[in-house]
From Swiss-Prot:
Residues 993-1005 have a biased composition (Low complexity). Coiled coil: none annotated. Residues 1-39 form the signal peptide. ATP binds at residues 687-695, 709. The lineage of its organism: Eukaryota, Viridiplantae, Streptophyta, Embryophyta, Tracheophyta. This is Probable LRR receptor-like serine/threonine-protein kinase RFK1. Belongs to the protein kinase superfamily. Ser/Thr protein kinase family. Residues 1012-1021 have a biased composition (Basic and acidic residues). It comes from Arabidopsis thaliana (Mouse-ear cress).
Length: 1021
């Protein structure tokens, strides 16, 4: 048998640099089941049947090893994703281990384009899994007479009726979700008395639920979402005593929810939403104590929220949004596992209990009649709960109804237009004869309960709901970006929401407006695979008036990845305009993956019909507008600082009587103020060493806590770094960049005051001795990686002034109280002037993080930061520094060790052993691969940071193959470490780097010793 490695070797002889070798085949060693180590023997009939199945399914190449019951290769038109699965399982007779038969085959996530095969020649077959393919045709009636117990055809193109003959089968599992089956649900399915799971969501099924389904007393999972059924929810569901999961979302059935639901004591996951019918009381769930998810959205439920819900200790998600609930809100004090509580769109009154407003819970109280709310209320305290939505949550008629936590809000002026780049950055767009500025909100992370008001602009958005079942709690998934796209930049980004997304403007001129909503479906594709099978439907409301029902972007635009503009009108009477997009449960939810649904929008244009939109009158380019608007203040600060240093301007505060009270120019402090804040630079306030200077904690006279960086003005380098940092930080504003509060130049002192980070640096949090470390689970580390990537993407691609940081490392990543990463120490930042392809510069940075082309030749591009980011991500994943880690054998640093782990297929060895029991293996391996691609030896092999962000968020494929380690001694990435190691061996030293930082793992001669050292450190009190 010729192995794949032999094939690869032959290929490499022909073409060494062919990186797309996997496009022609996939190698899969498949698990098999038999009871002897001897070669098994399948009947030739079954071997031939498998070959015929391959042809019918549309596989272009198939090689089946009958002696070992495994598939060696399945030829495909493209490399399947990591989730692809191909499996043949055989069983042999206990008395004759050569008498074997095929009992299962699975080809999942392969985009096979054929039809369903005949299986009559596989009489022992029990399981078929063909989920996530592109199979068309009908469901063969002959399958009903087989021995099948398990059928999964999730996400395909199958159509026609469900054969009634399946009522005579032995099925225990039937998943037909996300196809195009039509007709009614056969009443014969009621004969499947052993059936445990029946999943029929997202089809074209009509009619009522057959009464015969009452006999399915072994049912544990029943899902009928996104259908066109009729009739009421049947009371016979009380017979399903074993039921654990019930989903009826936009099924077409009407209410009320039967009261007998209370007898389903095994229910864990209850989802009933978007049902029509009369007003109904809250369904009785008092006896269903094991519930973890309760979704009763838009069910026309009235009355009060039952207090017993707050005693459900296992409850994680409670969504009662868009009903008619009144009264107060229970405390939910005993619901210890509660993570999401969505009560939007009701008529709730009174206060929100303090127990509800606790950290770690996402709370949405928007669109209610609460009376407690005021700027002084607990919910309005700064940073009290970052996941709290209070939009239109009070009954008051004042502006605070729309803009909570703002006292005596008054519009400074009224606008006649607004242009928003939803989920993107600020950009100018040519419209007719002008260029309009579309303000971006891409820097604002979303959330299951998010309220955002843009400072000084009087517009914002409210987002409601969580993407269920995606097993992802990162708020970055509420925006989308497609870096590789032929569309205009306006349609490469978008903002999405699971349930409801409302954009508003609070200060518009009254009158008639023309509204253009820009859409593009950037999550689905037009390719001939299952990615084009997705359906996204949502409703559009203007001023809370329904203007479009079941809006489908792909239908309107005649395909995916195609822009479409929806023109609408509005009349503004109270200076307030709302545009709400709402998901009503229709459309697919599992294409291309779980949790893909809900409204999505690329841009919004609002223009008055009677008053002109104010805009710049000159004909300058967008770059000129941005450079003047942002570059000029930076240049002024830069020049002032330079003149101060040269002594051309008076020093700050020399003749001031009371520098603490007098008002200073924005952004400046006196030396006395800084000394007062830091207790005269008391060593006890010293919190670390930044680039070229010490850092002190300080408290200003107004109570603001700052971090003060003290640089030496005696050094020309200190002066230059000071000016660089002032210019860089003052120009850049982003959630993942440190914020500058001000500076001071006085008495040979160069001082910067920037926002104080409660958790110091990432280096301190990860690599300090055990008692000083901050415990970080995998989701936290993943969040930090994403945040750093977004900050760098902003520096490189989104900021009007582009910067290369040049010194990305753990000590230059600061962490706020929520462990949000902030890139700091801009002292080495270089402006990418005139978008040059590279800059030849004097090398500055840190050994171990510097890209080889920069360290050796001073060749500087954005890709140098990408390299440093890759190394940093490996450190975050491993919990060990690159330079202080010395792997087993010839590995001289963490980067080389990680590359070796990829080659050996043991990627999880890179992961911090403290995380391995809990880590999401696929996610961790993907992150490591991203890090290795970023740290490729050649800059051309490294991605852009925007592509890195998309990879981490699952919106862009992670390369399966990464540039490997060069086995000759000249690999430029590791040469410095090898030379250093030889020098240390000659001098009997123990450190691994010229410049290193405190680490929890002392350097040793092998990977095992490094880990042992960390264990020793952690065992100390």
């Amino acid at each position: 048998m010729i192995s794949l490695y032999q094939i690869l070797a032959e290929k490499k002889k022909k073409k060494k640099n062919d990186l797309n070798i996997f496009a022609f085949s996939v190698f899969a060693i498949i698990c098999f089941k038999f009871y002897s180590v001897n070669a098994i023997k399948l009947p030739q009939q079954e071997v031939d049947a498998l070959q015929q199945i391959a042809t019918t399914l549309g596989s272009k190449f198939w090689k089946f090893d009958a002696e070992n019951c495994k598939i060696e290769m399945v030829g495909l038109t493209e490399t399947p994703p990591p989730t692809a699965k191909q499996e043949i399982e055989c069983e042999c007779s206990p008395t004759n281990d050569t008498d074997c038969h095929v009992v299962k085959f699975a080809f999942k996530d392969h985009n096979l384009p054929g039809t369903l095969p005949q299986i009559v020649k596989l009489p022992y077959l029990r399981e078929i899994d063909l989920a996530y393919n592109y199979i068309n045709g009908t469901l063969p009636r002959e399958w009903a007479s087989s021995n099948l117990t398990f059928i999964s055809l999730l996400v395909n193109r199958l159509s026609g009726e469900i054969p009634k003959e399946f009522g005579n089968s032995s099925l225990t599992y039937l998943d037909l979700e996300s196809n195009a089956f039509s007709g009614t649900i056969p009443q014969e399915l009621g004969n499947l008395v052993h059936l445990k799971k029946l999943l029929l969501s997202s089809n074209k099924l009509t009619g009522t639920l057959p009464a015969s389904l009452a006999r399915l007393q072994n049912m544990t999972d029943f899902r009928i979402n996104d259908l066109q059924l009729s009739g009421t929810i049947p009371s016979y569901i009380q017979n399903w005593k074993q039921l654990e999961r019930l989903e009826m979302i936009a099924s077409g059935l009407t209410g009320p929810i039967p009261s007998v639901i209370s007898v389903l004591s095994n229910l864990v996951n209850l989802r009933i939403s978007d049902i029509r019918g009369p007003v109904q009381p809250f369904p009785s769930l008092k006896n269903v104590t094991g519930l973890t998810k309760i979704i009763l959205k838009n069910c026309n439920i009235s009355g009060q929220i039952p207090t017993y819900l707050s005693h459900l200790k296992e409850l994680e998600t409670l969504d009662l949004s868009f009903n008619k609930l009144v009264g107060g809100i229970p405390s939910f004090a005993q619901a210890e596992n509660l993570r999401f509580i969505i009560l939007a769109g009701n008529m709730l009154e009174g206060d929100a209990p303090d127990e509800l407003l606790r950290d770690g819970i996402t709370v949405d109280l928007s669109y209610n009649n609460l009376k407690w709310q005021s700027p002084e209320s607990r919910a309005c305290r700064p940073n009290m709960n970052l996941n709290l939505n209070l939009f239109q949550s009070t009954s008051t008629k004042k502006s605070s109804k729309f803009l909570p936590c703002i006292k005596d809000f008054k519009c400074p002026r009224y606008s006649s237009c607004l242009h928003v780049n939803c989920g993107g950055s600020d950009m100018y767009v040519k419209e007719k004869k002008t260029k309009e500025l579309y303000e971006g909100d891409g820097n604002v992370e979303g959330g299951a309960a998010k309220y955002f008001l843009k400072p000084d602009a009087n517009w914002g958005f409210s987002s409601t709901g969580d993407f269920m079942d995606d097993n992802n709690f990162q708020n970055t998934r509420f925006t989308m970006f497609v870096p590789a796209s032929n569309q205009s930049d306006l349609y490469k980004s978008a903002r999405i929401a699971p349930v409801s997304l409302t954009y508003f403007h609070a200060c518009l001129e009254n009158g008639n407006y023309t509204i253009n909503l820009d859409f593009a479906e950037i999550r689905f594709t037009n390719d001939e695979n299952y990615n084009r099978l997705g359906r996204r439907l949502f409703d559009i409301y203007i001023q809370e008036k329904l203007v479009a029902k079941d809006f489908n972007i792909m239908d309107e635009a005649k395909g995916a990845q195609t822009p479409i503009i929806k023109p609408l009108t509005a009349y503004v009477t109270n200076h307030f305009l709302t545009i709400r997009l709402s998901w009503a449960g229709k459309g697919t939810t599992r294409i291309p993956t779980r949790g893909v649904y809900g409204p999505i929008i690329s841009a919004i244009s609002i223009v008055s019909d009677s008053k002109p939109c104010e805009r710049p009158k000159t004909g300058m380019s967008p770059g000129a507008y941005i450079a003047i608007g942002i570059g000029a203040p930076c240049l002024i600060i830069f020049i002032l600082g330079f003149l101060w240093i040269c002594g051309c301007l008076p020093r700050c505060g020399r003749q001031r009587k009371d520098p603490y009270e007098e008002e200073l120019p924005s952004g400046t402090f006196t030396l006395r103020q800084i000394k007062f804040a830091t207790d005269d630079f008391n060593p006890t306030n010293k919190i670390g060493e930044g680039g070229f200077g010490a850092v002190f904690k300080g408290v200003l006279a107004d109570g603001r806590v700052v971090a003060v960086k003290q640089l030496s003005s005696k050094s020309r380098q200190g002066n230059r770094e000071f000016l660089n940092e002032i210019g860089a930080i003052s120009c850049l504003q982003h959630p993942n960049l440190v914020k500058l509060h001000g500076f001071c130049v006085e008495r040979a002192q160069l001082l910067l005051a920037y926002e104080y980070m409660e958790n110091n640096s990432l280096s301190s949090a990860l690599f300090s001795p055990k008692h000083k470390q901050i415990p970080m689970d995998w989701p936290t580390r993943f969040k930090i990686c994403c945040g750093i990537a977004k900050g760098l993407a902003f520096l490189h691609e989104e900021s009007p002034l582009k910067f290369v940081h040049r010194d990305i490392k753990a000590t230059n990543i600061l962490l706020d109280k929520d462990l949000t990463p902030k890139i700091s120490d801009f002292g080495l930042a270089r402006l990418d002037e005139e978008e040059k392809t590279h800059i030849s510069t004097k090398v500055a940075g840190t050994i171990g993080y510097m890209a080889p082309e920069y360290a050796l030749w001073g060749y500087l591009t954005f890709k140098a930061d990408v390299y440093s980011f890759g190394v940093l991500v490996l450190e975050i994943v491993a919990g060990i520094t690159n330079s202080n880690f010395m792997g087993a054998g010839d590995s001289v640093c963490l980067l080389e060790f990680a590359n070796e782990c990829v080659e050996s297929g043991h990627l999880m060895q890179v992961v911090d052993e403290r995380l391995r029991p809990e880590v999401d293996r696929k996610e961790a391996e993907a992150v490591i691969k991203v890090a290795l691609v970023c740290s490729s030896a050649s800059p051309t092999d490294r991605p852009l940071m925007s592509e890195v962000v998309a990879m981490l968020e699952g919106l862009y494929p992670v390369p399966e193959s990464t540039p490997g380690v060069s086995r000759n001694a000249g690999d430029i990435r590791f040469k410095a470490f090898k030379d250093l190691r030889r020098g240390m061996e000659n001098n009997s030293k123990t450190q691994c780097s010229v410049k290193s930082y405190p680490s929890s793992s002392s350097t040793s001669s092998g990977a095992g010793q490094a880990v042992q050292e960390r264990k020793k450190e952690e065992s100390r009190p």
